[in-house]
Amino acid sequence: MTMEETVYFTELYDSYHGLLTDRQDSMLALYYEEDYSLTEIAEHYDISRQAVRDNIRRGQKAMEDYESRLHINAKRKKRRNLLLDLLNETNQETIEALLEIDGDVL
C-alpha cells in the first residue's frame, strides 16, 4: 500500500470507524493507528493472515462506500482548504463557499 493510500484510508477511518463492525473497527485501529502488520493482527486474534487481510479489505470497502454516499471526508478537506484561504485573505466568495458545503445560505 502506498503512503497516499495509507493517508487516505486513515482519514476515512477517522470519519467512519463508528459505522464499521466491531471486528473491522478493532482490526483497522490496529492496522492504521497502531501500525500493526497483518501477521501481528493475525496473532492477536489467533486467525490467519488472510482472514485479517479480508477483514481489512471489507472495512476499506465499507469506508469507501460511506464516503461515496456521505462525502464527510471530502467536505472536511474542502472546508480545511477554504479556511486556509480565509487565513490568507478574507473575502466574500470564500465565506459563501464555506457555507455552501453544509447547505447554509447567506
Label every PLM stretch briefly.
Residues N55-R58:
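Residues within the DNA-recognition helix of helix-turn-helix
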Residues N81-L106:
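Helix-turn-helix/homeodomain-like alpha-helical modules used for DNA recognition
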Residues S37-T39, Y45:
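Helix-turn-helix DNA-binding elements, focusing on the entry/boundary residues of the two helices
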Residues Q60-E67:
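C-terminal flanking helix
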Residues E11-L20:
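Short amphipathic alpha-helical boundary/capping segments
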Residues D22-E34:
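Short amphipathic alpha helix immediately N-terminal
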Residues S48-R49:
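Helix-turn-helix DNA-binding motif, specifically the short coil turn and the N-cap/start of the second
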Residues M27, I41-A42, V52:
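Hydrophobic positions on the alpha-helical face of helix-turn-helix-like DNA-binding modules
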